[in-house]
């Protein structure tokens, strides 16, 4: 991926599970729904457009286009309709059932203050996703980090 060093967000985490298990957690919605979104139209497959739904946010839906999948190495998606909004997962096998996952989001645009807010929000969001993944895969605990970031009680008028 060609990253513009001024307009991307990144989060990374060590997950103490084999790379195949960590990779599967991101392509298989039966697992991903335990730590991120609540529904998906199907499993990630290269060339397909998939709907991800966050029911806790009023059924907020994002359509992602899967640009490439390299088993146990990388996933690249286009996030929504913006062709520049690209998210990439990189999986590194550290041996001894340890996987280092890096998520990079490129395509942040706008004025400087808008870009700073997007970088902050995307970095926070993917950090919560990785922390939720870690808790789920390593300890079989669903922390509900994504849902609890914006509790409905704080958003109701």
Where are these regions (language model features)?
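Hydrophobic ligand-binding cavity/cleft-lining segments
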Residues: 1-41, 156-157
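Short, surface-exposed coil-to-beta transition loops
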Residues: 8-10, 59-64, 84-88
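Generic structural detector for well-ordered beta-strands
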Residues: 12-16, 53, 65, 90
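A short, structured loop/turn motif at beta-sheet edges
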Residues: 19-20, 67-72, 91-100
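Hydrophobic pocket/interface hotspot
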Residues: 22-26, 32, 50, 66, ...
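Glycine-rich portal/gate segments that line the openings of hydrophobic small-molecule binding cavities
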Residues: 39-81
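Beta-strand/loop substructures that line and gate deep hydrophobic ligand-binding cavities in soluble
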Residues: 81-128, 146
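Short, highly charged C-terminal tails/helix-capping segments
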Residues: 135-157
């Amino acid at each position: 991926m060609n990253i513009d060093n001024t307009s991307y967000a990144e989060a990374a985490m060590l997950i103490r599970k084999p790379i195949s298990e960590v990779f599967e957690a991101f392509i298989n919605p039966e697992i991903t729904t335990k730590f991120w979104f609540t529904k998906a139209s199907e499993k990630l497959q290269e060339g397909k457009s998939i709907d991800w739904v966050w029911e806790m946010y009023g059924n907020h839906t994002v359509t992602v286009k899967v640009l490439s999948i390299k088993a146990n190495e990388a996933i690249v998606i286009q996030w929504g309709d913006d062709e520049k909004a690209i998210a990439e997962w990189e999986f590194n096998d550290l041996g001894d059932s340890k996987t280092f996952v890096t998520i990079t989001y490129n395509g942040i645009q706008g004025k400087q203050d808008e870009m700073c807010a997007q970088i902050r929000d995307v970095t926070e969001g993917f950090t919560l996703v990785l922390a939720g993944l870690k808790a789920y895969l390593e300890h079989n605990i669903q922390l509900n980090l994504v849902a609890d970031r914006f509790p409905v009680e704080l958003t109701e008028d």
